[in-house]
């Protein structure tokens, strides 16, 4: 029989890096979170309070409520073939701001800047959707210095 403890099977999952053990730094507590922020849940095993279940370690969710020492995070969990929204309460030590939407945020800011420039110049801006790369272009091989080689198979010969 295996025990059904809350932290079972986390010997390596919750292990800290070399010389990174102990309490979280002050900067962790000074980080500001707002409703709508995307956060990565990364369990800090040195802090037992507000620790989420091992299932949520490494998952990304959205903050829907901010408390003085904790966050309420909503994320999707697959349950029997469908995705259910799970709402969990996690202390600040176990989360960090996610970088999952950095690229799209940059693209949005760049598009807004281009729209302002176009408006100031009085030019209509073309749609800035990303284009799919598509297949490679056709290439012609000249036969001047390239002798054609017949490609085929050799019959199987038993040596012994």
UniProtKB/Swiss-Prot annotation:
Any one of the GO CC terms: ribonucleoprotein complex
Family matches, as PROSITE patterns: RIBOSOMAL_L21E (PS01171)
InterPro entries: Ribosomal_eL21 (IPR001147), Ribosomal_eL21_CS (IPR018259), Ribosomal_eL21_sf (IPR036948), Translation_prot_SH3-like_sf (IPR008991)
Keyword line: Ribonucleoprotein, Ribosomal protein
Annotated protein name in UniProt: Large ribosomal subunit protein eL21
Keyword Ribonucleoprotein: yes
One Pfam family recorded for the sequence: Ribosomal_L21e
Family: Belongs to the eukaryotic ribosomal protein eL21 family.
Record GO biological process: translation
Gene this chain is encoded by: RPL21
């Amino acid at each position: 029989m295996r025990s059904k403890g809350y932290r079972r099977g986390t010997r390596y999952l919750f292990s800290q890096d070399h010389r990174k053990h102990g309490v979280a730094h002050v900067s962790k507590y000074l980080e500001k979170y707002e409703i709508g922020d995307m956060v990565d849940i990364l369990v800090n095993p040195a802090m037992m309070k507000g620790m989420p279940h091992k299932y949520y370690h490494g998952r990304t969710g959205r903050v829907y409520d901010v408390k003085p020492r904790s966050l309420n995070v909503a994320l999707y969990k697959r349950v029997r073939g469908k995705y259910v929204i799970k709402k969990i309460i996690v202390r600040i030590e176990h989360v960090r701001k996610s970088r999952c939407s950095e690229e799209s945020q940059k693209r949005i800011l760049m598009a807004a800047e281009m729209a302002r420039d176009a408006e100031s110049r009085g030019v209509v801006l073309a749609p800035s959707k990303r284009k799919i790369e598509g297949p490679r272009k056709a290439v012609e091989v000249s036969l001047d210095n390239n002798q054609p080689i017949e490609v085929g198979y050799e019959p199987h010969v038993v040596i012994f």
